[in-house]
Amino acid sequence: MASSDSSYSRKFLLITFLPLSLACLAFLLQWRSGVNDSVTQWFDDNYPFPGMATVSEKRSLRSDSSCVSLLGQSRTQAFPYLRDLKLDHKPDLKPRICITTSTSAGLEQTLPWIFYHKVIGVETFYLFVEGTAASPNVSRVLETIPGVNVIYRTRELEEEQAKSRIWNETWLEKFFYKPCNYELFVKQNLNMEMAITMARDAGMDWILHLDTDELVHPSGTREYSLRNLLRDVPADVDEVIFTNYESSVERDDIKEPFTEVSMFKKNFKHLPREVYYGNYKEATRGNPNYFLTYANGKSAARIQDHLRPNGAHRWHNYKTYPNIKELDEAAILHYTYSKFSDLTSRRDRCGCKPTKKDVKRCFMLDFDRAAFIIASTSTSEEMLQWYRERVVWTDDNLILKLLRKGILTRIYAPMVIIQELREAGVFSSVVTSAHMSLSKNRSNSSTSSNY
């Protein structure tokens, strides 16, 4: 009887655990990519999503300033979540968001800027390019990126913009026919006006104007998503304002601000009044103002009839006064003067005389004026000393105090996203793909000419 019970028990256990064992085996095989299903078949590469890699898996940042190191090492396979670098946003993903910018930056700045904003939900980019950005080696790469529209400053463009109604409006007239920053400001508005038309024709829902040293920080949203943020905006709101935070660099040898800067000074609008005014002097550190440059943020506007730019930071409407909402948490991260070389690059773009009188004709902000004079009249050693005193944060005790007060804050999300994109080979793959496409076209052209 005991033998019979023992045999029965073994059979019962076998019948019970065999299906469970087979189910576990099937799960393990599928998890190890031994079996493909409708989900895993699209993500069969072994690259992690941004932020999933362990510390031991992360490679240290290279310290050299070459374009190759900044764009990352090339890989044969593209980042799986970008699927061959297309990052196509289907029209049914609402709202559809676009960004317009006027830039002369190189690929080491524009590629991280573009793909970061693609990750958080931006679909289309209108890049009005000049200088380095318009050079063949840069522009031909930008033109290969889906969703990126490259607009050159041609004679035809200037003739078209000369007909703009902006020239007859009073709200911008004080900036007309002045050099340097004033000229750029007018160009930005003319470009924004053209971008509105292109965005409407493309069926966009929202438009932002950003510089390529600015990143949207959609803090407080689900999945760190700009699309989710704008989707939740009430239907009667025409425009939302992002306050800006300003980069606070802790070294004078920053090469790639987006992945080397994590500390920012918060806008006074996101601070209690007593904290802001009580620590103003220490937070300013002898500079003309609380922020080195602008403090009025940037805004996003719904694409609608009669929309117009209202300076580089706002939008307006020719027919009605827009209903505007200020966002409580989301911000624009402004990486201003985050590299020592920014002093000379800004100087080289302007032909003003380095005098206190003339710089007022060329620059709107006090810090820009002071920086231009220093960069134009000082030795490299004097410039570096000035930069360390005015821009770089080196007092650990002061940093700790202002972090505790909430004036300074650490923000890591953009750094993580961009570094993971770089380590996945996204930026270098774009460059390689563009060069291969160019070589192929040249080869085909050469072959055709032989017949």
Curated annotation (Swiss-Prot):
Residues 1-23 form the signal peptide. It comes from the Eukaryota. Glycans are attached at residues 36, 137, 168, 441, 444. Its EC number is 2.4.1.-. Residues 109-345 form the GT92 domain. InterPro entries: Glyco_transf_92, KOBITO1-like. It holds the Pfam family Glyco_transf_92. GO terms for biological process: cell differentiation; cell division; cell wall organization; cellulose biosynthetic process; response to abscisic acid. One of its GO terms (molecular function) is glycosyltransferase activity. It is found in: Secreted, Cell wall; Cytoplasm; Cell membrane. GO terms for cellular component: cytoplasm; extracellular region; plant-type cell wall; plasma membrane. Belongs to the glycosyltransferase 92 family. Involved in the coordination between cell elongation and cellulose synthesis by promoting the expression of genes involved in cell elongation and cellulose synthesis. Acts as a regulator of plasmodesmatal permeability. Maybe a glycosyltransferase. This is Glycosyltransferase-like At2g41451. It comes from Arabidopsis thaliana.
